[in-house]
């Protein structure tokens, strides 16, 4: 029998107050229908959003091991929808319409649905206004999780409709220690992983993936070699770099195709 997996919430040990607050909210049945996670980049807001989504959709408040929890951890659950701005100037109206059209639909696998809206400060007035009513009174079983850096740079109408959750700044040293505890790797390697991946949780995933580490090594070698390269070498090595970059993406695409096949009957 495979060992039980820890829930994503349990792994948020660099944000203990956030972890405990969200855990208690889900366990007590008092989870809000709309959260606004606020904090600096690298504070773990996106990791916490996926963790909350996992706990909210799990019938055991985030056991970490059931089919639903595994799918959320792999970012392949059909009832967790992740949005990020598709334009350099912010969210497009088409994105908002797509979200609003999906909200009334029944969940595919779970009994509820979660919408994660990253960089919510880039919701412009024309796109944000369309969200307001749904954000204030969403259908039963729908949760919104918005991520932003500061309430001061967001529309007040959005902030007032969400329960704000502040995230403290996590120092590189604390982040590296968290990764070291989870992986058993030395601190120097863990500091590198956090710097490369952007957060403790993704740093742990990086250290557990031989493919990602190999791709990074090849990219670093290719970039270093460009210093002494002539024009012909630059073109040749640029092409090889593209191959290296595409390799992990091909792996992700293969995983996504398998998930689509599994969900084809829904």
Where are the language model's segments positioned?
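Short loop/turn elements that form and flank the Walker-type P-loop nucleotide-binding site
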Residues: 30-31, 73-78, 108-111, 138-141
């Amino acid at each position: 029998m495979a060992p039980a997996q820890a829930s994503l919430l349990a792994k948020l040990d660099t944000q203990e107050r956030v972890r405990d607050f969200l855990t208690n909210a889900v366990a007590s049945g008092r989870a809000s229908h709309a959260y606004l996670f606020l904090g600096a980049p690298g504070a773990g807001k996106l990791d916490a959003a996926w963790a909350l989504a996992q706990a909210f959709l799990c019938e055991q408040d985030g056991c970490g091991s059931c089919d639903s929890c595994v799918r959320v951890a792999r970012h392949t659950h059909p009832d967790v929808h992740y949005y990020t701005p598709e334009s350099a100037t912010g969210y497009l109206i088409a994105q908002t319409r797509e979200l609003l059209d999906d909200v009334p639909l029944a969940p595919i696998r779970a009994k509820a649905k979660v919408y994660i809206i990253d960089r919510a400060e880039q919701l412009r007035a024309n796109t944000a206004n369309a969200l307001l009513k749904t954000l204030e009174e969403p259908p039963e079983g729908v949760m919104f999780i918005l991520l932003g850096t500061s309430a001061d740079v967001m529309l007040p109408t959005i902030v007032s409709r969400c329960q704000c959750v502040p995230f403290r700044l996590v120092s590189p040293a604390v982040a590296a220690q968290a990764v070291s505890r989870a992986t058993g790797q030395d601190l120097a390697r863990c500091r590198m992983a956090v710097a490369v991946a952007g957060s403790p949780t993704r740093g742990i995933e990086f250290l557990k993936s031989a493919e990602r580490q190999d791709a990074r090594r090849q990219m670093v070698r290719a970039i270093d070699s460009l210093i002494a390269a002539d024009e012909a070498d630059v073109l040749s090595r640029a092409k090889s770099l593209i191959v290296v970059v595409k390799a992990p993406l091909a792996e992700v695409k293969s995983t996504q195709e398998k998930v689509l096949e599994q969900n084809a009957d829904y």
